[in-house]
Amino acid sequence: MSAVVQREALLKKIDEALKSGKKRRFRQSVELIVVLRGIDLSKPENRINLLVELPHPPKLNKIAAFAHGAFETQAKNAGVDAVITRQEVEGLAGNKRAIRKLAKQYDFFIAPPDLMPLLGRVIGPIFGPRGKMPEVVPPNVDVKTVVERLRRVVRVRLRNEPVIKVRVGAEGQKPEEILTNILAVLEELNRKFPLRQYLRDIYIKKTMSPPVRIKPAEVLAR
């Protein structure tokens, strides 16, 4: 990625964003906003929904497992924050309020393949549009490894507008840590949409601070 992005130039912009705005009484997040151009989002192949693992996540995600049988035991041993059983899923049927609450309560979900038809019927209409459908864990995959990865990921989505918004840090983190997080996101994005061709602007901002605009010419290597 260093061949595409000038690290030092981007690091200066991160430092500028961290110093901007007033002090707040809470720990502000640092957000990355990427604006793309020349992408026809009416074509399904141009919409993306990626999970990118951050080298220095600002917080660890909360993970819940839809589970039963051996998978339930594996999920508990992997240290998930909650287990929702088959019976509990069946009890959610038709209860949109409870399903919405569940979707907000956890960052990511996992499930075994055999539960997916039930989950598709019960939670799919609400979880699907929110990008919260469970990650399917095949029988031969170590559940703990999946959970540990999901603790550190952010979701990168491109759907109706050519704009991506991702939390890449928080106040108190070193600028270099936030830089490596941003580079991880940009690297994945560059694989799908080469930045030299499709990047319009980058913005970095804290939760309550004005964004720092970064033009492609300022950070893309020549």
UniProtKB/Swiss-Prot annotation:
GO terms for cellular component: large ribosomal subunit. Keywords: Repressor, Ribonucleoprotein, Ribosomal protein, RNA-binding, rRNA-binding, Translation regulation, tRNA-binding. One of its GO terms (molecular function) is structural constituent of ribosome. Disulfide bonds: none annotated. GO terms for biological process: regulation of translation; translation. Coiled coil: none annotated. CDD domains: Ribosomal_L1 (cd00403). InterPro entries: Ribosomal_uL1, Ribosomal_uL1-like, Ribosomal_uL1/biogenesis, Ribosomal_uL1_3-a/b-sand, Ribosomal_uL1_arc, Ribosomal_uL1_CS. Part of the 50S ribosomal subunit. Binds directly to 23S rRNA. Probably involved in E site tRNA release. Belongs to the universal ribosomal protein uL1 family. HAMAP family: Ribosomal_uL1_A. This is Large ribosomal subunit protein uL1. It comes from Pyrobaculum calidifontis (strain DSM 21063 / JCM 11548 / VA1). The gene is rpl1.
